[in-house]
Structures are given as C-alpha cells and as structure tokens.
Amino acid sequence: RERVAALLGCKKGALGKLLCDAALHPIEPVVSDRKAPCQEVIHRVTDEDFDLFKLIPAPTNTPVDAGPYITMGMCYATHPDTGLSDVTIHRMCIQSKDELSIFLQPGSRHIGAMAERATQLNKPLPISISIGVDPAIEVGSCFEPPTTPLGYNELSIAGAIRKAPVELTPCISIKENAIANAEYVIEGEIQPGVKVIEDQNTHTGYAMPEFPGYNGAASHECWLIKVKAVTHRENPIMQTVIGPSEEHVNLAGIPTEASIFNMINKALPGKVTNVYAHPSGGGKYMAILQCKKTVHTDEGKQKQAALLAFSAFPELKHVILVDEDVDI
C-alpha cells in the first residue's frame, strides 16, 4: 500500500479519498496521432507464424490452471449503440493460436453489457487488450458500478490521478483504440453469442487462483475472442497478477474504498472520515469505516453508513465501525 501511495503521489491513508476525488473530477482520454510505443512491432493473424502461445508470455500459475492466463490486460471496448467506451480488467485464457476466452461476470461489468448488445445485433464486438500500463490506469480500471455506471470511461479517472489525459492510439486491425504506452496490445473481436468452456484444453475443472485464496472453478460460459493482431514495444515487459496477493488487494480494495466513501458522503456528509478495505477481505469482503460524531444525535448514523455500504456492494460481507481516534 505504501508503494501504491508513492506511485500515485499521496499518503497511504488518503488513497481512497484520492480516487474518490478523481472519479468526481475526471479527465477524458485523448486519441493521439503520434507513433505509439505499443506498435513498435506488429504481428498479424495472417502471418504464417502467428501464435498467441509464442507471442504472449502468459503464465500458467498452478498445475490445475485452465491454461496460460492474461490477468492484467486493460480491456477496452465501445458500446455499439451509444458509442461510449469503457475499460475493465478480466481474466483471459489463451485457448488456441488465435483465440482467447474472456470471463465476463453476468450483470456486473460494462463490457459484458456491450457484448450482450452486440450479440443482439449479431455483430462482433471489437476489443483491445493493453498489457503493461502505468499504475493510475490499472487502479482506475478496477472501479465498478455504482460509482462508474455504464457509459463512464474509467480511463478518465486515471487521467485525473495523473493530472493529464491517457493517450490512446487507433488499433491496426479493428475499429477500436488501445492504450498508446502499453507494452503489449492484443486486438480482437468478441464473437456474438459464442460461449466456450474455460478449461477445454486441460479439463481440470479449475480456472486460476481467485482473490480469496482458492482455485476458482472453470466457467462454461466464457465469451470467445478471435484475435486479429498483436502489437508490442521492442523488448516488451509482460505484467501479470494472481488473486491471493497484496497487489490484487490494492487493485480491488482502493477503488472499493473510494466508492464507499463517495456514496456515504453523499448521504451523510462529513460523518465518515475514511474507509479501509482490509486485506483480510481481499479488498472486497471487509470494510472498516472511520466515523465522526459531532453531536449526540449522530449516534446511529454510523449504522446507516454501514447499511449504505452493504446495499451498494453485494460482495461486502463485513463492515467494522470505529471512531475517528482509531488508526485504520
């Protein structure tokens, strides 16, 4: 957490507030016409030697994993009706030399809604996957509804954190943009209505390690991405993360803190001074709320704050309420 604070330029106890302020004062991304670092080397699916297993050094983390996983890919797509774009992080498994499976949690993520709508239109959904970007983009991409509703581009949160817009570049093989300073970019299309079994190559029954610390079950309802191209920097650096780790706790937990703080502050201004998504809950299951009571009638409002947090975040299981003199 101290390293994240140093990377984002604030104190570790103020990370949630920093992200909350960034979400309230977004700076939209821009499309640049300069030569993008992520396109220094280009591989097209039509190349004779094109093979994702060789081009992307994605790790297989455990003996029972469904395959090599991309876990730090910034998935960027645009809604086919509104033209509004979104970035999120999803687990993706390399299934063949030109195919990825992508797990989109039903009903909870924007790109899932975009893929559903594209399927209704019987059209593929163009998607870029940018790997190896700066920390502001990675943390900003982990925001979820209700703080960032459908149509809210989380790259604008990263822009606010960086105090400068995120630069995008047009993809070379699909009608979509990618993050210009990425190490790798995978360009492809989510196939309309096509679902695949995540462990179709291994048949282990598992996907990969999840954030609570156990191996997650393989999904039978993963969407299929047909890859069109891979671009990367000269001598690119691959970035990855697995679920049970302090790195994942920060990626998931700090945006959760910001979202809870933002929601409660709207309903009960000034009554909650800070929020901490404790590592014991993986950044999702447990939150500590630091409450401020100025008059005797404030007693009870801390319970209202807890109920607000529970109502907004279905994954939340425990909320601990403390006074403002407790160091969280």
Where are these regions (language model features)?
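Extended, highly charged
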Residues: 1-224, 228-328
